[in-house]
């Protein structure tokens, strides 16, 4: 498996203050890109932009970890820059970070709740008429822990039409008091039938599915306080449900935790496909199968 690590800055959020477009261009010029690639600003002044999900029509939905806003962005004239920004909600007060568009609907994850915005793009058309988002979301789950440490969520609907929701460890390193922590869960789209899909996952904020095998691949952020050089963050693959990926007992496939590692050997757990380096905090992960990149980028996983 070849792995390509590329950083794409598609949003510049309001945590960074720019006095003019020249300052933005100077920032972009500091980013090293492969030959033939170009980077530009898609949208500016999107408060605390964090997670994104894109509809087939090109609408970009944006969640955040610090503000209370969820936005929809449209490039109406196709010039690669946002022409219209919609405030879908400013009433979700507990880190509405996770967003996942699926068949006309938008799922939004707070720390402890999952919301459904039905027919979201149809409602954006009504927004143009009335000047505000016309419908309140539907609460489909309030059964997740309220811990904010690793509590913000990346979510996505999988190829099995179920919603995948991680639950991070409520600490840097600990044995959790409830088995729901340090997992990836999945549920039906109405919030029912939640189950644990993967265990021993400290804090994943990026996962995707292989376009041919259908297997989930996910990044995991490694623990702190073992120095600058240990342990690595990870890229993992899920071949079957309910397997354990090591946390808090083993890190990087072969590093026994100094506090909890004596309880289980590293051989008891699924090893990473790739160690990514210590404290690199991998986030989004995608397999590329579009038609804009060179052929050698096809079917590679991008982190």
Regions inferred by a protein language model and the residue ranges of each:
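Residue-level detector of Asp-centered blade-edge/turn motifs that repeat once per structural unit
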Residues: 55-57, 101-103, 157-160, 210-213, ...
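Asp-box/WD-like beta-propeller blade repeats and closely related beta-sheet repeat scaffolds
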Residues: 112-158
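Conserved beta-propeller blade signature
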Residues: 59-62, 105-108, 162-166, 215-219, ...
């Amino acid at each position: 498996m070849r792995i390509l690590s590329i950083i794409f800055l598609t949003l510049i959020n309001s945590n960074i203050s720019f006095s003019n477009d020249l300052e933005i261009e100077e920032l972009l010029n500091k980013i090293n890109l492969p030959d033939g690639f170009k980077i530009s600003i898609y949208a500016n002044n999107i408060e605390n932009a964090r997670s994104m999900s894109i509809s087939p029509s090109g609408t970009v939905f944006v969640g955040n970890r610090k503000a209370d806003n969820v936005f929809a962005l449209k490039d109406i004239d196709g010039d690669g820059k946002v022409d219209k920004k919609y405030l879908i909600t400013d009433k979700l007060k507990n880190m509405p970070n996770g967003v996942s568009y699926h068949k006309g609907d938008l799922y939004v994850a707070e720390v402890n709740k999952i919301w459904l915005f039905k027919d979201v793009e149809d409602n954006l058309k009504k927004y143009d008429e009335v000047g505000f988002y016309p419908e309140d979301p539907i609460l489909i789950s309030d059964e997740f822990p309220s811990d904010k440490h690793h509590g913000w969520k990346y979510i996505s609907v999988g190829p099995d039409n179920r919603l995948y929701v991680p639950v991070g460890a409520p600490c840097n390193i600990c044995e959790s008091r409830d088995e729901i922590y340090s997992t990836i869960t999945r549920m039906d789209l109405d919030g029912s039938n939640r189950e644990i899909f993967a265990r021993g996952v400290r804090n994943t904020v990026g996962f995707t599915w292989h376009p041919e095998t259908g297997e989930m691949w996910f990044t995991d952020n490694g623990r702190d306080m073992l120095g600058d050089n240990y342990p690595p963050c990870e890229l993992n693959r899920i071949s079957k449900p309910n397997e354990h990926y090591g946390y808090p007992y083993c890190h990087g496939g072969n590093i026994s935790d100094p506090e909890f590692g004596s309880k289980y050997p590293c051989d008891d757990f699924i090893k990473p496909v790739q160690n990514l380096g210590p404290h690199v905090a991998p986030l989004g992960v995608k397999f590329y199968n579009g038609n804009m990149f060179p052929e050698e980028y096809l079917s590679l996983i991008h982190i």
